């Protein structure tokens, strides 16, 4: 690893309580705002292509199967990258790891806008997926390092809204760009914005509290659950921690299988939702993408409710809130599918409620993985479940495109309804699991 990418060493520990408190308050706000902005732009460069899909299909640039193939390639590569990057990011300098990854995705989006062949699109989108994996594990590690167990749900939920803001704005940006300049201009705009913010991350983001001379967050907040997690596995090597607390941890595997199904639903609605609106209601690209924006708006609110509720109502136990939201996914998907009449307002409302319920488990499962693992393996644990999440998302690409071609939208909704129902069943063992960490 290049020297500047290595995690910074611990600085001499401060002793002045007032200075420690002041620095913790400043850096906790600063870290959250910085990773929030960075991840929102990761989302811009991840969903730029999806937002342009109706325009690309209308222009005959790619077929529906081509679109599904690119989505599947992206999700598989992104899932693998999240796991590998999670392991690497646990011992890397957060500011450069995340910043360089974002700059790379920006450059690739610009190149995508200049490309014309399916092979060029495929190669560039696989590369984009690889560098996209440099974002989320870093954020998970920093959220675990700067915020303790009994408060983390609320802070993690605030960061998680970056998904929704990025996901809500990029369809509007792409639709406006496509309307006036073509979809390629939208890809280039997203890429340029990502490069600027990536440079900002390299400049202003910081690593763990200990690298700034601060005590661990559990000691600072006197959080017994956090201190207990910090003290687990003392004396183990990184390889032993990874094996015991991630690869052989049954709770991590159960969360992973559940994540597969949650992401089938999330990716299906996110990637095919605008096409569903276009084909069933005959609306234009701007109107169709507005429905996807409602999905993200619902997710924005749902993530905040899920994070706050798991902290305040269940004392940091993510299981009950996860189950409630998983049941909500099934009901809201069924409402969109079985709606007896075609109405933009009602369908957009269903997109909102699906987003509300999907982004609860989307956030809480990743957080639960970090908390069910070792403190020094937070990035690896979230990366591991993320690998399975995007294997699930890949099923919403080419395989779901084939379902659409054969059984049309009825087959589409049958698949995602089954996925939602099974995901709820897999979360039952977590109802009473407060701190399951090892096998």
UniProtKB/Swiss-Prot annotation:
Entry-linked InterPro entries: MFS, MFS_dom, MFS_trans_sf, OPA_Antiporter, Sugar-P_transporter_CS, Sugar_P_transporter
Q: Where are the transmembrane segments?
A: 26-45, 67-87, 96-118, 122-144, 163-183, 185-205, 245-265, 290-310, 323-343, 350-370, 380-400, 411-431
- Which residues lie toward the Cytoplasmic compartment? 1-25, 88-95, 145-162, 206-244, 311-322, 371-379, 432-439
The record's similarity note reads: Belongs to the major facilitator superfamily. Organophosphate:Pi antiporter (OPA) (TC 2.A.1.4) family.
Q: What is the protein named? A: Membrane sensor protein UhpC
**Gene Ontology BP annotations:** glucose-6-phosphate transport; phosphate ion transmembrane transport; phosphorelay signal transduction system
Concerning Pfam families, the annotation shows: MFS_1 (PF07690)
| Segments in the Periplasmic topological domain | 46-66, 119-121, 184, 266-289, 344-349, 401-410
Give the matching PANTHER family.
Answer: GLUCOSE-6-PHOSPHATE EXCHANGER SLC37A4
Which GO cellular component terms, listed alphabetically, does the Swiss-Prot or TrEMBL entry include?
A: membrane; plasma membrane
Q: What is the protein's species of origin?
A: Escherichia coli (strain K12)
Q: How does it sit in the membrane?
A: Multi-pass membrane protein
Role noted for this protein: Part of the UhpABC signaling cascade that controls the expression of the hexose phosphate transporter UhpT. UhpC senses external glucose-6-phosphate and interacts with the histidine kinase UhpB, leading to the stimulation of the autokinase activity of UhpB.
What are the UniProt keywords, alphabetically?
A: Cell inner membrane, Cell membrane, Membrane, Transmembrane, Transmembrane helix
Localization in the cell: Cell inner membrane
User: GO molecular function: any one?
Assistant: glucose 6-phosphate:phosphate antiporter activity
Q: Supply the Gene3D superfamilies for this chain.
A: MFS general substrate transporter like domains (1.20.1250.20)
